Design a protein with these regions (language model features):
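Chalcogenol-based redox active-site neighborhoods
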Residues: 1-162, 167-171, 178-184
Length: 184
């Protein structure tokens, strides 16, 4: 089911976390913090909306790194009901797509809940003070095909954050598959 992100809650502080990466390391938000901003992305392996923009995400994150913005991807989906989103498949997905940023597993789903993440992809763009400035889309999709007419909305927003510490006032929500929550 297609789910859209809510509007940006400007200034909301990033929630600290410590999660395991596909490299087997425990990584914290504090370690990831970029000099000019931090991009936290909730993604997964199986969602067609994520798959459609994975190349764009990787390219954007590589470019953002050059301007002092660090990026991290987190998968919070329930791998029991969605085996394609298992930790082993996360490792394969990160390697296949040449992730230059950490890909973390949120096994308890506490991080996704703390961030109020709703879908994959769900982007949280923070300034250098870890204050939320962007909660929009990567770029426009038409029939799950990215419209590549210049830099992505995500890149432009994060570049603005790096330059001014503030995100764009007008943001188009991200849309994708709902997070696959565990049910006890």
């Amino acid at each position: 089911m297609l789910t859209q992100t809510p509007i940006c809650d400007f200034g909301k502080k990033a929630i600290p976390f410590k999660l395991k990466s596909t490299e087997g390391k425990i990584i914290s938000l504090e370690e990831l913090k970029g000099e000019n901003g931090t991009l936290v992305m909730f993604i997964c392996n199986h969602c067609p909306y994520v798959k459609a923009i994975t190349k764009d995400i990787v390219e954007d994150c590589n470019e953002l790194k050059k301007i002092g913005i660090n990026s991290v991807a987190i998968s919070s989906n329930d791998p029991t009901n969605y085996p394609e989103d298992s930790f082993d498949n996360m490792i394969k997905f990160a390697k296949k797509n040449n992730f230059s940023f950490p890909y973390l597993i949120d096994e308890t789903q506490e991080t996704a809940k703390a961030y109020d993440a709703v879908c994959t992809p769900d982007f949280f763009g923070y300034n250098k003070d870890l204050e939320l400035q962007y909660r929009g889309r990567s770029r426009e999709l038409k029939n799950l095909i990215p419209i590549r007419d210049g830099k992505s909305d995500l890149y432009k927003a994060m570049k603005l954050i790096a330059e001014t510490n503030n995100g764009p006032k007008d943001q188009i929500p991200s849309a994708g598959c709902s997070i696959k929550w565990k049910f006890d």
